[in-house]
Amino acid sequence: MQNNEIIKPAKYFSELEKSILLALVEKYKYVLECKKSDARTIALKQRTWQALAHEYNSQPSVSLRDFKQLKKCWENIKARTKKIMAHERREKVKRSVSPLLSTHVLGKEKIASMLPEQLYFLQSPPEEEPEYHAEAAAQESFAVSNRELCDDEKEFIHFPVCEGTSQPEPSCSAVRITANKNYRSKTSQEGALKKMHEEEHHQQMSILQLQLIQMNEVHVAKIQQIERECEMAEEEHRIKMEVLNKKKMYWERKLQTFTKEWPVSSFNRPFPNSP
């Protein structure tokens, strides 16, 4: 192979290159996957992709890529992962999950953790609601005694009693059903609260990472300014040294000329006698 031959990058990403790209994207995910779309965030994302490309190309055993190629590869991986996750969700609804789907994408769980949940969760087709069986509902969770449920039934359900009528008191199975509904509602509320806290934490992490990148940019700008000042000082010192060397050479040549015109022996001659 000749030395002047240009080596073109490989057309497709290898598995090693994809794993390196995923590791770098996970490092900067709070910036690259930020939902903000203002001009400042877009410019910051582009600078982050450029920094990611520089860090990617510094890795051994990878082909040289620019940030546009890396960004396109990440978008393709995201689209493929979202499609597979949506298909798996539909298959789970149909109770027939295919085990072969989990091998199509490298690190599917890792990629899914970097994507917002609403991106790949598609709306599943509605299913027919199963018939309600009172006996099965009575045998659900909450393995507590009937006395405990009946003692606490006022906390869950209230039945109005009309005067002059003899209505039977509610059974413990009805109280159990109501308690189960309240438990499920409480569980869903706790899940929503936990999800809200996680989103808030992710937003805070995104803001901190943006601030870190901005501080890094300011630090790099200061270093570049100091380097430029050092270069200017070195250039000024070089010019001054050249001027001094020229002056030195000038006076050396002048001294040589003076020595030739006025040799030292002429000063040793005796002066003529004065009249």
UniProtKB/Swiss-Prot annotation:
It comes from the Eukaryota. InterPro entries: Myb_DNA-bind_5 (IPR028002). Residues 13-78 form the Myb-like domain. Signal peptide: none annotated. Residues 211-247 form a coiled coil. Keywords: Coiled coil, Isopeptide bond, Phosphoprotein, Ubl conjugation. The keyword Iron-sulfur does not apply. The modification Phosphoserine is found at S96, S98, S274. Belongs to the MSANTD3 family. There is a cross-link at K154 (Glycyl lysine isopeptide (Lys-Gly) (interchain with G-Cter in SUMO2)). PANTHER family: MYB_SANT-LIKE DNA-BINDING DOMAIN-CONTAINING PROTEIN 3, REGULATORY PROTEIN ZESTE. This is Myb/SANT-like DNA-binding domain-containing protein 3.
